[in-house]
Structures are given as C-alpha cells and as structure tokens.
Amino acid sequence: MKFGNLGVWFFFDGLSSPDSAKAAQRIESLGYSILWIPETVGKNPMVLASWLLANTKKLIVATGIANIYHREPGVTLSAQQSLAEQSNNRFLLGLGVSHKPIVEGVRGLKYGPPVATMRKYLEDMEASPYTGVSGSEVPPTVIAALGPKMLALASE
C-alpha cells in the first residue's frame, strides 16, 4: 500500500454522516492520498471508516489510532479484513495501546504493560479465525509507538 508523503488527520465526531462523507470527498479532491481517523469516546472508527471508504474512490482511510482495549483481537481482524475487501484494499489499520487515564479512567478497563499487551494482541489477531472473503492483498497493520520498545515491536 502506497500512501504518499502527505495525509490528513481529522476528527469527525462533530460532523453528521453526510457531512463526514463530503469532508472526505473534499480531502480526496485536494489530492491527499490518506485520511487518518482517531478513536476516542465518539464515533466507532471501523464504522466510520466503512462509511468514508464507501463515499470515496481512491482515498486510503486509516485508523489513527484504534484502541486495542476497545475490541477483542478477532473482532479487529474481522473488521480489518472486511474493510479491506469492500474497499479494494484502501483500509489501513492503525492500532495503539492508548493511555492509562483513558483506558482505566474513562473506559474502566485494566491497563497492562504496553509492549507486552500489544504483542499479545497482535499474536491473538494473527491466530484468530476469519472465514469471510478476503481482499487481493493482506491488509497492513501499523502500530502507534511512543517509545523505543514499542517502536522496535512496530518494526517487526
């Protein structure tokens, strides 16, 4: 997947679905090749990605980032494969461990050691069954890295 040197990161929570589609179309018309969408406590990034991909022609849509604590690894794999297949491989899955105050304070979940937790999550994703139709390419996964140990994992 090639996505050029310049993309856009945009927070869509304040926009309606029709306005989100128009914004993505505008971003695409301006020549940007990739649109990064975050995950907080608003719109589901996988659902939003599906909508934006369905309303653009060549724009790559990437989660930047999807929080691994918000969904089970097999569910993430299924979403990744489905989005890649329905968009002709224009979906890029970006994952991250988020931050302890968000995971524990906002979501009420237990925050684990970042690198070990991410490694286990990726292993569990890879081991998860998926029986749906796959795209012509293996969809890429990128991970957010805030330090050298996570950066080393990202390079694997």
Stretches found by the model and what they are:
Residues 1-56:
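N-terminal beta1-alpha1-beta2 module of alpha/beta enzyme domains
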Residues 47-50, 74-82:
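Pocket-flanking alpha-helical
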Residues 2, 45-66, 70, 117-128:
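Alpha-helix-loop-beta-strand connector modules within alpha/beta enzyme cores
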Residues 31-33, 55-59, 87-89, 153-156:
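Glycine-enriched alpha-helix->loop->beta-strand junction motifs that scaffold or abut catalytic
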Residues 77-156:
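Internal, glycine-rich beta/alpha segment that forms the wall or movable "lid"
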Residues 4-10, 33-37, 60-64, 91-95, ...:
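Hydrophobic faces of well-ordered beta-strands that scaffold small-molecule active sites
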Residues 11-13, 40, 66-68, 96-100, ...:
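Active-site beta-loop-alpha junctions enriched in small/polar residues
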